[in-house]
A protein has these predicted regions:
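Hydrophobic pocket/interface hotspot
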Residues: 14, 18, 112
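A short beta-loop-alpha structural element at the N-terminal edge
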Residues: 2-14
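Conserved acetyl-CoA-binding loop-helix of GNAT-fold acetyltransferases
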Residues: 73, 79-94, 104
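Conserved active-site alpha-helix within GNAT-family acetyltransferase domains
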Residues: 100, 106-133
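A generic "binding-loop/recognition-motif" signal
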Residues: 10, 64, 107-108
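Helix-loop element at the rim of GNAT/NAT acetyltransferase active sites that forms part
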Residues: 17-29
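A conserved beta-strand-loop-helix scaffold within acyl/acetyltransferase catalytic domains
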Residues: 29-42, 47-48, 54-65, 69-73
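C-terminal "cap" of GNAT-fold acetyltransferases
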Residues: 126-173
Length: 173
């Protein structure tokens, strides 16, 4: 299995896989243009024969925080290590950039506990994530995802004040 940074020609495969899980709410729907614009965030896994198996993205909020996003593998690749290899590559990339806090929102926290992630009870502790994505998410008022972080929770925010994130999260209820 090969894990590598995505190339622009991978965008249609990433788009198809990510959006195949958007209908049931597992992942948020992403536009093809958005995938293309952010393709450098993605890492992909391929079989030894070059078959696309899965992807994951690492989004940078600043030198203090990044987020693992859209980590997904094809059904036939589940339990074969592709997701683990992608996640390990994303963690390594964050470490190469000197980022000590990695966050994510998920419905499968047990997978991420094995990699040093822990739950964050109050999502407003991650104001950059709230301001970048959550306030425009269609599930804002009924979010069922678990916030998790690996490393310390950042004490700085570049996108919005912590107090406003706290209000936004608590208004969502």
């Amino acid at each position: 299995m090969l894990v590598r940074k995505a190339l622009l020609q991978d965008a249609s495969k990433v788009y198809d896989l990510v959006n195949s899980l958007s209908g049931d709410g597992t992942l948020l729907k992403r536009a093809f243009a958005e995938i293309c614009e952010n393709i450098r965030d993605f890492t992909v896994a391929e079989s030894d024969g070059g078959v696309f198996l899965g992807c994951g993205a690492l989004h940078f909020y600043g030198p203090h925080l990044c987020e693992v996003r859209s980590i997904v593998v094809k059904p036939e690749a589940k339990s074969k290590g592709a997701g683990s290899r992608i996640l390990a590559a994303l963690i390594e990339e964050a470490e190469e950039h000197g980022i000590q806090s990695i966050c994510l929102f998920t419905r499968i926290p047990d997978f991420f506990f094995r990699y040093g992630f822990r739950t964050v009870e109050d999502k407003s502790e991650l104001p950059d994530k709230i301001f970048k994505d959550c306030q425009s998410c269609p599930r804002l008022h009924r979010c069922d995802e678990v916030a998790m972080v690996r490393g310390r929770i950042p004490r700085v925010s570049l996108l919005g004040p912590r107090e406003e994130a706290h209000q936004l999260v608590h208004l969502a209820g």
